[in-house]
């Protein structure tokens, strides 16, 4: 990994919490020290940091974080200022400048906003600024949240074309079973095939965090399909990120990049955009898609949802499992009229189409291999 150009680090609230409440200032200082060390190696760094809610809980003297949405958002609004101020002071002491970037789900769901976020982050990195990214908890709608910063960090890694994502956590990596419940659990140091380990992840997070191992494996799916490696590292050994960059392999779990990676617009189609509905297809159409073909009307058996032309839809097999997603050339109303029909009949029914494809392969990303 000695040829890394850009690294994304995600630190969760469990790594930032002080045992007595609020933020652990020492943890902030350690993170700043790691970032400074990374920059001294000539590697650019983006930080995705939780902690706003925990910081707000400490600032307001609360014993636990609120459970309702309004309470969480109010506490996050208080805490985000505390969090970024601590980071700014710690980095400034090391000669570095940081920038706060708060992203909502819609910032990555809409293609134009996705590009704007991408351009802003690229400019910050050209200025040699450390972007510190968090979800914009204060205005997020529950149905349109990232859910956790593990997923956000993976999307950010794709957004900035990173080379490696490091997720700091409160365990040494991925285990064969939950190490907190099973003392015989063994650390899995390398993962080449995610499908072989998805079943072993425990879903529980900490009291202040929202992400368990399931969310980290989802982040690994996104990151590795983007063509990047991902490393799970215990936050108590965060300084070993420097060793990782220098080509050594510290204790933890490394997820290898997928053999078939997705690039450019197809990254946004797969994981950035929000789908408006579903198209159901027969087995023949599934086989065609897996061979790199476009989706034609003849293979479509049903639809669910309402959408207009050029919007994003899921494409499901007969069992309802998503096999692809893409930008559809027909509205849901138009597609209902022509589903199951051959191309000639479709074009005769809806004459103002540019081609016979319902979803062109250039505007489609496979979600299974």
Curated annotation (Swiss-Prot):
It catalyses: L-glutamate + ATP = L-glutamyl 5-phosphate + ADP. ATP binds at residues 10, 169-170, 210-216. It is found in: Cytoplasm. Gene3D superfamilies: Acetylglutamate kinase-like, PUA domain. Catalyzes the transfer of a phosphate group to glutamate to form L-glutamate 5-phosphate. HAMAP family: ProB. Residues 276-349 form the PUA domain. Its main location: cytoplasm. Pathway: Amino-acid biosynthesis; L-proline biosynthesis; L-glutamate 5-semialdehyde from L-glutamate: step 1/2. One of its GO terms (cellular component) is cytosol. Its EC number is 2.7.2.11. This is Glutamate 5-kinase. SUPFAM superfamilies: Carbamate kinase-like (SSF53633), PUA domain-like (SSF88697). It comes from the Bacteria.
